Amino acid sequence: MKRCLRNGNGVNEDRISDLPEALLLQILSMLPVKDVVTTSVLSKPWRSLWKLVPTLKFDYENNQSEDETYSEIVCRLLLSNKAPFLESLHLGFRFGECRSVEVGMWIGIAYARHVRDLVLHVESVKGSFIFPTGLYNCETLESLTLRSWVLVDVPSPACLKSLRTLRLENVDYKYDDSVYNLLSGCPNLENLVVYRGNLLEVETFTIAVPSLQRLTIYDDNDGEYCTGYVINAPSLKYLKIDGFKALESCLIENAPELVEATIMNVSKIINEKLLETLTSVKRLSLALSPLELKFSCNNYSGHLLL
């Protein structure tokens, strides 16, 4: 039965409310949380529909209110959600706006709701937000993004058995062991994206993940500090390296299944061992201007499609 909505010019049919609930929830999942909640005033069928949306995205800009703080908004809406499971939780806030214990509680609730995708984005000019160490343990999490001023402190091996995708974007690391403990606790990790700037608490970034298939490293270090990478990924098929000043400190120890490699925005390649490890690659893309090789590459051209 089609419902009708009256306005000053006549009668309009309410076709949207006749759509299947699953489709309506999919549409609502694409909207900011603030807009999703406002749909509750449309009509009676919409009154509680927003509580069933399985994705919650809280950005600072879209969740400001004169009556409630960011923390109060997140807590209220997270506890009001009645979806069978939580597909995605995105928390974006400014440093000092939320306490670590609050964020830990929200993520703990999401873990209890079997969340699959978690994004934590912290904006700061003062310091780094400490991601609660106890939250590196979740059976259902499939995708994790830690972005900007987040301190990664993993004193013991993590337990993220279902994690398939991990993005570490300009975060801090307390110790070298934090990287090892995090990655070693992801036995099914397939896609790893690492963005690094001048925050160089880790001198050698070791990536030893047997299940890894895709790896992207973007290093925006201006060259003042020396950073190193060691890659041990026997299942790796796709590799992208972007932004290095000089590829002298990237060692690929084990990547026999590598099919495609892309090297971009690199000033020069001065480490012959790097190309020696790429002999199994079917396609090598070099986006270097100007291209400067400190050695002959004649020994490798027969294996590569340039």
UniProtKB/Swiss-Prot annotation:
What sequence ranges are listed for the domain F-box? Answer: 13-73
Q: Where are the LRR repeats?
A: 67-93, 98-122, 138-170, 171-196, 215-243, 263-288
| Keywords per UniProt | Leucine-rich repeat, Repeat
CDD domains in alphabetical order: F-box_AtFBL13-like
InterPro entries linked: F-box-like_dom_sf, F-box_AtFBL13-like, F-box_dom, FBL13/AtMIF1-like, LRR_dom_sf, LRR_FXL15/At3g58940/PEG3-like
Q: Please list which residues make up the signal peptide.
A: none
Disulphide connectivity of cysteines = none
- What Pfam families does the record tag this protein with? F-box, LRR_At5g56370
Q: PANTHER family, from UniProt?
A: EMB|CAB62440.1-RELATED, F-BOX/RNI SUPERFAMILY PROTEIN-RELATED
Protein name as catalogued: F-box/LRR-repeat protein At3g26922
